[in-house]
């Protein structure tokens, strides 16, 4: 449905899946563009995961972060993410919703949303230390086809996660992992 997503790509299948899912995981940035190369914020990624989970009821759930307004579009998603161990924020009192979500953060949020399954594989990327907070998440994602590196030997954990990357990760995680 978007002019900037070629029909003969995996991205097209992922965007179509996210756009037509119920509840709808994401929409375009305009009626005709998806902006797959645009970066995602932490609020956007958590919101996509919350929608993928079916937007469960979070009424009565406390919002522990001072930087998330109760009426923010992502407030329920953040409540859900905290209550389900998907995130603990960037500190005890902040979530940093408008910060760009890195590839390491995105894959960790997906991994936690999947229940942080046991990982038997080791990380095969030179830029992912075995003791990095995201090492198990990267190993799980690579082993299950959720995401690959930015090259055969690098994952680029500190790079910004794009809209195209997160939608493909969600699609693969939901249909393959």
Name each region found by the language model.
Residues 1-12, 25-76, 88-104, 112-135, ...:
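Feature responds to low-complexity, polar/acidic, surface-exposed segments characteristic
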Residues 15-18, 49, 78-81, 110, ...:
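A short amphipathic alpha-helical interaction element
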